[in-house]
Amino acid sequence: MKTNILILSVSSLFVAGTLSSCTESWLDVASKTESNSSNYYKSQDDGLRSLYACYDGWQRTVSGGPDFTLYQLTETMSDECFGGTGNTDGRNTQILDRFDMNEAPSYTDMHNKLWGLYYAAVFRCNEFIDKAEGISWDDTRAKDTYLGETHAIRAICYFDMVRTWERIPLLVHATKDNVPQANPDSVYSLIVKDLTYAADKIPADAYPKADAVTNDGHITRYAAMGMLARVYLFYDGVYNNNEGKPMPGGLTKDKALAYCEAIIQSGEYGLVNRFKDLWPASSDDKTGNYIDHWVDKSSYAGVGNKETILSLKFNYTGDYDGNEDGNRFVVMLGLRTNGDVYNRYGQGWGALTVNPKQAAVYGQGDSRRQASIIDCQQLQNYEQKYIADQREYTGYAIKKYTPLSKNMTNSDGTTSLVSYLQGDMAGDFMISQYQDWVLLRYADVLLMASELGSSHAQDYLNEVRKRAYTQSDGSLNGNYTVISATKENIWRERQKEFAFEGIRYWDELRQGLSVASNQIAEHSTVLLSGGVKEKVNIDALNIVKKRGFCQIPLTQITLSNGVLKQNAGW
């Protein structure tokens, strides 16, 4: 751990050259031209740049290229997907899918880079929080806003880590100490306190939704409130058997519900009219030949739409020189097409093939199935041309997050399908995908409020379900029915509404380890790997032994001189 933290102190340098390395020269002379930790953190502008550095650190947990981003990790472990990827690739993905190191025993460090990226982000937040009182603030509003966002970023990073590994070091100051793993309750207490700080301190009008074109991506007080509700429900399910007890940090069920109701009553958010318009690939209204300019006919609601409460932003400015800005999990999900740009979809690596069980959960007339899943069997010649290179082919792929194509006019006047990124700076389809990861939608707040016992629970559930069965003319199709707002029905609705959004696995764990392990288990399920039938078995006992948590990277245990201990079952 100690050596790794030394690396983190270097990686905490700010983007765009605003900070340089804080090393000691033999003369020990302060730089007159560059910023470092001794002459920085003076002005409010320094505070703003510090906040940007914290956002950058958080973004790099995805754009930094870990072996598995949190999104891919959780989708692989859920019952929504199989690991997939190429038929001759290493089987590290299958370790996650089966919760079984026997799939590839040498992969003892799968999550080492992800671990380091998260702690690098935490280091930046800690350093800014530690130094904030030394800044000459122009006004308290800016201070409250910037620090509120920073506390929220730290909380989100710790929430991701404690859900993934459970037993992690808790660092609340910028330190190089070799810190042992904390009691999870201590981590959750900090998460609650940080998010509460953000909900209290960030002004309600700091980033109005009406101005999303200029402020989208900033964490608002409502995003912090929504995350508090999510944290409460996860903790209550995993540690309190869904009994509605108070959790560490003093967060209660009533308070979590009040946060959801405050978001709903704010008037800032609402449901996008049609579910499919939430996603670029799903909002394609094109008919006819696939060579058409399908993007021009998209009904996509756009980034920062009225339903988005919290998202992690990306862009296409990344390169291989340390500027890491793209969404690295999108290309992993793309159709594996041997380098071809096929149909309206761009190329990818074929990870996270959709479990047919997930494709079967949607009722007749539920628009969410088509908006969420690519039916590869409906793509012209796809199976004949491409599945020989695909592992764990199921006939289905994720549509919500997938690379896209566009039609480009060549110099001779002909047209070609190319990657949607071609012509945009580096245009590298592997590192420049810029679709945002939407972390919290208004629909989630409605369903969390229902689950937490709102007096409007039935209305909130109906609102979400009606949207799923709404036709293009705005009317409900004949398949819509009202279902009662029981906890079990709400959980089933969440499976349909939030499929492939990085939510399902956590929802399964909070239903109880026995329920989760049996939902995820597979018994001789037949898939195609390299075009040949393969039986997949996922033993529920493997999940139970590990309690649903991931392997602590061996490198981190070694660097800590054994202070860090491996999780049970790994």
Listing of model-derived features with the role each one plays in the protein:
Residues Q94-M101, P356-R441:
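Flexible, polar/acidic helix-loop-strand segments at domain edges
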Residues T23-N92, T196-Y197, H218-E392:
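An aromatic- and glycine-enriched ligand-binding surface/loop that stacks and positions planar moieties
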Residues N36, S43-G64, G86-W165, K176-S189, ...:
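Conserved, well-structured interaction surfaces
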Residues C22-T23, Y118-A121, N215-D216, S282-V341, ...:
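Long, intrinsically disordered, low-complexity segments
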Residues M1-S9:
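Bacterial N-terminal signal peptides that target proteins for export
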Residues T3, V15-S43, I191, A229, ...:
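Bacterial Sec-dependent N-terminal signal peptides
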